[in-house]
């Protein structure tokens, strides 16, 4: 058996974390890693104590026909990146890497996944250095967070997701 490379190893863990997700549209799993230690994990789901969409059987954004990338304030879920960030001390996130995996409701990999504008802001402020996103079974893209700072998509009409 061939040993799994480290990036896909961490992406596999993020994919397992994603299985806890409770969104009816898409679920994501995030892990934050620094110096080969997992600092925090997060998945898509309602805030603690609130009912999840899978328990309610409906998605408000879907019932209102809101397209992907718009009106996230109407969503019941906290995004996986946000869940992971709020569960970790900032000093442990500075210079860390986020590993992100997303799947749609049919269980297909979201190949063009990216963090939303709010999560990008949180990632920047947390001091995270890189975001690695699974694009296929063994493939991924690497984003240097500094690129999000230098190429501020909030100043254009490009939403980035």
Predicted regions mapped to residue ranges:
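Zinc-dependent deaminase catalytic domain
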Residues: 1-161
């Amino acid at each position: 058996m061939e040993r799994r490379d480290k990036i896909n190893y961490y992406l596999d863990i993020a994919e397992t974390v994603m299985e806890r997700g409770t969104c009816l549209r898409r679920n994501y799993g995030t892990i934050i890693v620094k110096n080969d230690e997992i600092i925090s994990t997060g998945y898509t789901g309602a805030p603690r104590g609130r009912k999840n969409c899978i328990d309610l059987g409906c998605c408000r954004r879907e019932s209102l026909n809101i397209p992907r990338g718009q009106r996230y304030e109407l969503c019941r879920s906290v995004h996986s990146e946000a869940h992971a960030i709020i569960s970790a001390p900032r000093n442990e996130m500075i210079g860390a890497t986020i590993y992100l995996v997303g799947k749609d409701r049919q269980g297909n990999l979201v190949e063009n996944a990216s963090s939303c504008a709010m999560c990008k802001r949180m990632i920047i402020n947390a001091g995270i250095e890189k975001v690695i996103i699974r694009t296929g079974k063994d493939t991924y893209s690497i984003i240097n967070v500094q690129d999000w700072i230098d190429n501020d998509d909030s100043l254009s009409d490009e939403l980035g997701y």
